[in-house]
């Protein structure tokens, strides 16, 4: 039987009374690609393991802690979840993920494309279909503004290789901030090869200390968005994409609420072949860095994450067969009638939620 969703926009007090936490409840996996902030955000040691690093990432961003984590270069990811299903509300934005993107004041192309520091991350979502509370079900990508564009490549694999102990650094004499231009080698499934340089601003090991000698990531990769506007390597602008990515637009645009900055719709979900799918809700989110680009003294494009939360934590699902004797749709929670469709519906302050015509 086809399912429908009804929405109760109750007060935040309602949400907490029910024990629902709108913020990240748990980080299940933290697997960054190499990068200049890796092993420092959060701090890692050689004694760490995937489990201890997931716990450190959890301590940083779960439960509204808002301590930044870095995903490193292309493919680096984090998997987190919520203590409830985030419902797919038709026509609404369902959840928000915060990064540290900002617009540049001296942006030469501000009139045609906004930019500054944009390090976009792709979002994937999953339901708890097997009801085991773990993110081990099918993943769906949220198809942002670049998903169907020719420059975007899907099923792309990139592998990074740990730098050998006997490696000899290759500095760049023209750009002294680049102390090693052949630091971490990488290769791709399309035959590309290159290096992630090391800079003088971040001198720790860029390769995740708790990983093996190589790491591979597979996913969607987007076109580079960084431009050396100075042509001398002194001023880079990374331009924003239109919508659908983490750490791409600023977290808040108070003068432009229509932009829905850093907000996401579950309705954007597509399957592995790019076909739209309908999900009535999701419980798990995966974010990974979407671009492989090195922007001079700014370093690699690396998605950062600060926080994430449900935009309508008081929403409750409704099935079509929940009817009263007069054919009106009803929903209960803990034995209390919350919404009655087919009649006017009000919240606890008397404000109308749904008007029956």
Which residue ranges define each predicted feature?
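Tryptophan-centered short beta-strand motifs
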Residues: 133-142
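Short loop/turn segments immediately following beta-strands, especially the blade-tip
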Residues: 126-132
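A domain-level signal for the mature, folded cores of soluble proteins
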Residues: 18-121, 143-315
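Short hydrophobic alpha-helix segments
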Residues: 142-143, 356
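Bacterial Sec-dependent N-terminal signal peptides
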Residues: 1-20, 316-319, 350, 354-357
